[in-house]
Each structure stands twice: as structure tokens, then as C-alpha cells.
Swiss-Prot record:
One of its GO terms (cellular component) is membrane. The keyword Membrane applies. This is Bax inhibitor 1 homolog. Its main location: endoplasmic reticulum. Residues 218-238 dip into the membrane without crossing it. The keyword Transmembrane applies. GO terms for molecular function: calcium channel activity. InterPro entries: Bax_inhibitor_1-related (IPR006214).
Length: 254
């Protein structure tokens, strides 16, 4: 039934349907079971809460209290380990504990990013908001692509990520020992951006596979993985926009 609905969506008959109706049909996600859609709704609600908590962590670190680098690092690692090692049982007490730990992880991750955000705000205060909006747009776009397609691309993407990671490592070594080169630096940043996008597709499709085929409906764990995909993409876009702003400022001074 689901595959038939999906085939109908891409059939030539769909050309006669208005665009808004096509979008409505697509967003019904008929290729996914009802149980999977319910789980995904909870996952993305948890992710939204995590992003909001991280934002609070950034503001807390900027305006109230900023711990040292070592303490922040220990807090991030410690909270992540606590979250990952807490039993994934479904009883109420454990779920409350894991939800608290999940928000602690996102909060301290936000704290750890505050210094970087302040640095880029000094260049141009609009960079951070633009980077966040761009991150949301890219993340949502590739998430929808991953959910709407019937083809499970995670095996192909996994091998591509492995090759890309090796390429990024080689580029990093070249930058470290070969001196600064503008084209090489741009290639390095674009490679990291590509890997961030591929991780969104890979992790989303792996999540759907585990929910549908393995019955792994651990909402908080899936949200935890996607949260770091979002944060990594945000940091990369932030760096790209800041680099572009610096370049424009240098041109205007000449």
C-alpha cells in the first residue's frame, strides 16, 4: 500500500495536480508506517527541545557564568557518557532521568559553543542568525529528502563518508605542513560541509531503518544523534559565513 502510494506520487498523473496539493501529499509520508511516523514526530520534538536548551546554554555562558575550557570539556564528555550509559528502559523514572541528561548534554554543548559564537558576533552580529537560519533550511531539506525517498542510501553514503573522511584527513595534514593556501582552505571547508550534509542523510536513514526493521524506538537516543548533526552543520556554516564576511571587509578596506 505504501509503495503504491509512493509510485502514484511520482507518476505522470501528478502533473495535473496543483503544487500545493503535491506538497500536502508528499508530507503525508505514505512510504512510512503509522508507528514510524509517530516515533519520528517524538524524535523531532525532542530535537527541537534540545536545540532550544542549547540556545539557553549559549546565553547562560555569555551573560551569566562561563566555566573554563577544561571544565566545559569535562561537562560535555561526562554528560554524554552518562546519557549513553543510562539503561534504555521504558519505565517512567528512567525516562525522566534520560530526558534530564539529554537536556544537560544539549545545555553544556551550547555553553561550549558560546565562545565561538561571540567571536563571530564581533565580526558581524547578523552572522549567527544567518548561520542558524541556513542550518535549519539545509537540515530540514535533507531530512525531508531522507524521509521521502524509498531508496535506503545509507550503505552507499556510509562508504562515501569513509572515503570523504580520509580525504579530509589528508587535506588537514596538507594544510598543517604545507602552509596556507586559499584554494586548499576552501576545498577543506567544502569537504567538511559535504560530510556534515551526508551525515544528516546517513543518520536519518539509519534511524528510520532501526525504527521500522529493528523496532528501536528510543526517541532520546535518535534525537541525541541528530542534535550533534545539527550542531556540526551550524558550526561549519558559521565558519563559512564568517570567512566570507572577513573577505568582504578586507576588500572594502582596499
Amino acid at each position: 500500500m505504501a509503495s503504491t502510494s509512493n509510485r502514484n506520487f511520482f507518476s505522470s498523473n501528478m502533473t495535473q495536480i496543483p503544487m500545493d496539493e503535491k506538497i500536502r501529499i508528499a508530507l503525508q509520508f505514505n512510504n512510512l508506517s503509522q508507528s514510524t511516523k509517530q516515533t519520528l514526530t517524538k524524535v523531532y520534538c525532542a530535537l527541537a527541545i534540545g536545540i532550544l536548551t542549547a540556545t539557553v546554554g549559549v546565553l547562560f555562558s555569555m551573560f551569566i557564568y562561563r566555566p573554563g575550557f577544561l571544565m566545559t570539556l569535562l561537562l560535555v564528555i561526562g554528560s554524554a557518557i552518562l546519557f549513553a550509559t543510562t539503561p534504555r528502559t521504558q519505565d517512567y523514572k528512567t525516562q525522566v532521568k534520560r530526558f534530564t541528561l539529554f537536556n544537560l548534554v544539549t545545555f553544556v554543548t551550547g555553553m561550549s559553543s558560546s565562545g565561538l559564537i561571540e567571536l563571530y558576533m564581533d565580526i558581524n552580529s547578523s552572522i549567527v542568525l544567518n548561520a542558524f537560519m541556513a542550518t535549519c533550511g539545509i537540515f530540514i531539506s535533507f531530512t525531508l529528502f531522507s524521509l521521502l525517498t524509498n531508496k535506503r542510501l545509507y550503505i552507499f553514503i556510509g562508504s562515501s563518508l569513509a572515503s570523504l573522511s580520509i580525504g579530509i584527513f589528508v587535506l588537514a595534514l596538507t594544510r598543517l605542513f604545507g602552509g596556507y593556501s586559499e584554494p586548499l582552505d576552501q576545498l577543506f571547508i567544502l569537504a567538511i560541509l559535504a560530510s556534515s550534509v551526508l551525515f544528516i542523510i546517513f543518520d536519518t536513514q539509519i534511524m528510520v531503518h532501526r525504527i521500522e526493521n529493528l523496532g528501536e524506538k528510543d526517541v532520546l537516543f535518535h534525537a541525541f544523534i541528530l542534535f550533534y548533526d545539527f550542531v556540526d552543520l551550524f558550526r561549519v556554516i558559521l565558519k563559512i559565513l564568517a570567512k566570507k564576511e572577513n573577505k568582504n571587509n578586507n576588500k572594502s578596506r582596499r
